[in-house]
């Protein structure tokens, strides 16, 4: 039920681009019933990406979603890094090459580019890790990739938000399916988060749930979201919190 997200790009580390991709991916995985355990960001460096992918795989999540670094430029090295991290070769996907060719010919016919030929940068995008299943990019040139490796489902997606979102919705989520996952939102009538913290910790020790708390400034309420796979566990958690004097209102 655990998942991790890895976003890639020097622009994310310098602050020139806000990483909205990881938030979108995490929200969609949560809706599908996965708990996102970590979100990691790394720059466009093969060795750095390899190291981080290795660390993630050692934690054995069920799902790893990677976003960014699939384009035609010199610093788009994600597919190479992922392949090396998995001990695989990069191999040409002929189907991907044909689609990339058609994509640039369409741009040329519409007057967006002046040369539709497949230069080395464009060809590079057709290479995927050996054994990977290509994921269709309906909004751009670079295909994504789906790889199952030692029990981990790995998805490699583009970094352009529009392309990433479409690929996640159309190619990734259907392969994951929806798991039984419940969440309920409450407002806890308590003003001091430090007094609520030990009660939440006790609830987490007693029940198979996850609890997210978000203070609303120094107002009257603290927001709570309780996540569970079993409705009984969720209900017992609510009853326990109320037995400890925490008044809960559905949010």
Curated annotation (Swiss-Prot):
Signal peptide: none
Database matches in Pfam families: MoCF_biosynth
Family to which this protein belongs: Belongs to the CinA family.
Source organism phylogeny: Archaea, Methanobacteriati, Methanobacteriota, Thermococci, Thermococcales
SMART domains for this protein: MoCF_biosynth
PANTHER family: NICOTINAMIDE-NUCLEOTIDE AMIDOHYDROLASE PNCC, NMN AMIDOHYDROLASE-LIKE PROTEIN YFAY
Database matches in InterPro entries: CinA, CinA_Arc, MoaB/Mog-like_dom_sf, MoaB/Mog_dom
Protein name: Protein TK1472
